Each structure stands twice: as structure tokens, then as C-alpha cells.
């Protein structure tokens, strides 16, 4: 399978080298890296080219790298039933740099891009309906960013007396606890009953 993927990577470099920044086969999967401005042309080529035939759109997801200037990777997964192959297309983008929407090439990208927007704040130009899809309308922040607090910003609960949803500041029921310590089974000097044989001498 990796031989066929290497051949496909070589074919993509030859046929559309100007659209591709990198193409590598790693862990039995082909990953193609492109710039945002070349994304739509590359996805169209992968879908329409006879040698490729990546007509099945699987997923779009985001990956957060807060230490990089282009903080996010937008990752597209495609499947070619004819070739029985998968390809991953990666595009790097910054917090305020939009990526062209893939909905013109693959209409099924619609809700996946909305999810990436909702969870990471990744913007997509040309998207027909870019709004939150998983979180509440008034939700603040983007929960899958690595700098999003674990407790969130507000606590949402249903107030049975008021018969409505109530937003309140987060109130921790206990003080923050640091669990960075040795367990009772690590670093002990004594021998527990039954461990005499397992203990090195």
C-alpha cells in the first residue's frame, strides 16, 4: 500500500507541484501540505483527476499549535473508492487568517467547517452559513484551543424555579489540587506481604 501511496505522491508533485508545498508518506498515510490560497484548486484536482478520484469527503478537523505563528492546521481527509486510498490535506493558518471554504468542491464540508469554527475559531471564507453548531449561541471562547481554561468561563445550568437556563460564573466546589506526587506503590522501601519474590535483591 505504501508503494502505491509513494507513486501517488510522485504523481501529485509532477502534475500539480505548484499547488503543493510538501507530500510525504508516513505511517502508511499520504499527507499533502498546501497553502490556503491553493486549497480549492488542489481539492478540485484530487476530486476530478482520473488517477486520483478522491470523490468521498471524510472529514475536516483543526489542530492547535499555540507556539506557531500560523497557529492552526486545517486538515482535510479524502477517500478514493476507485483507488482504495486515502489522502490527508493540511493547510496552516493564523488566528485571523481565513481559509477558503471547501463547500464549493465538497458540499459535505459544511458542518465540519462549522465545527472547526465553533471549537477552534478557524474562519472560512465563502462558507454559506458559518455559525456555531455544537456550543450555545452566547458561548464565549473556543473550547478545543489549548489556551481555553479547563473549567470554562461560565457555568450553565437549568434553574427549576425560574424555569430557564442560567449562566453563572464558574464556582469550584473545592480548592485546586495538585496531583503531582508519588503513589503509595512507587518509591516504597518496605516489602509488602507476597512481594518478597518480586523484589530485586
Swiss-Prot record:
Keywords annotated in UniProt: Cell inner membrane, Cell membrane, Membrane, NAD, Quinone, Translocase, Transport, Ubiquinone
Catalytic activity as recorded in UniProt: a quinone + NADH + 5 H(+)(in) = a quinol + NAD(+) + 4 H(+)(out)
Gene3D superfamilies: NADH:ubiquinone oxidoreductase, 30kDa subunit
Mode of membrane association: Peripheral membrane protein
Enzyme category, top tier: translocase
GO molecular function, one term: NADH:ubiquinone reductase (non-electrogenic) activity
Localization in the cell: Cell inner membrane
EC number(s) from the headed UniProt entry: 7.1.1.-
Chief location of this protein within or outside the cell: membrane
GO cellular component, one term: plasma membrane
Family as reported in the entry's similarity comment: Belongs to the complex I 30 kDa subunit family.
Protein name: NADH-quinone oxidoreductase subunit C 1
Amino acid at each position: 500500500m505504501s508503494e502505491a501511496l509513494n507513486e501517488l505522491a510522485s504523481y501529485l508533485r509532477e502534475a500539480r507541484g505548484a499547488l503543493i508545498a510538501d507530500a510525504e508518506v508516513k505511517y502508511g498515510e499520504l499527507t499533502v501540505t498546501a497553502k490556503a490560497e491553493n486549497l480549492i484548486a488542489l481539492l478540485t484536482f484530487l476530486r476530478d483527476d482520473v488517477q486520483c478520484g478522491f470523490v468521498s469527503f471524510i472529514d475536516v478537523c483543526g489542530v492547535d499549535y499555540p507556539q506557531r505563528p500560523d497557529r492552526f492546521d486545517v486538515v482535510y481527509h479524502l477517500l478514493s473508492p476507485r483507488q482504495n486510498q486515502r489522502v490527508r490535506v493540511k493547510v496552516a493558518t493564523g488566528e485571523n487568517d481565513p481559509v477558503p471554504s471547501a463547500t464549493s468542491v465538497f458540499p459535505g464540508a459544511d458542518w465540519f467547517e462549522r465545527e472547526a469554527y465553533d471549537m477552534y475559531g478557524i474562519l472560512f471564507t465563502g462558507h454559506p452559513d458559518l455559525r456555531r453548531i455544537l456550543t450555545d449561541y452566547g458561548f464565549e471562547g473556543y473550547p478545543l484551543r489549548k489556551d481555553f481554561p479547563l473549567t470554562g468561563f461560565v457555568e450553565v445550568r437549568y434553574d427549576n424555579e425560574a424555569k430557564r437556563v442560567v449562566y453563572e460564573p464558574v464556582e469550584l466546589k473545592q480548592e485546586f489540587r495538585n496531583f503531582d506526587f508519588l503513589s503509595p506503590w512507587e518509591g516504597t522501601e518496605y516489602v509488602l506481604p507476597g512481594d518478597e519474590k518480586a523484589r530485586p535483591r
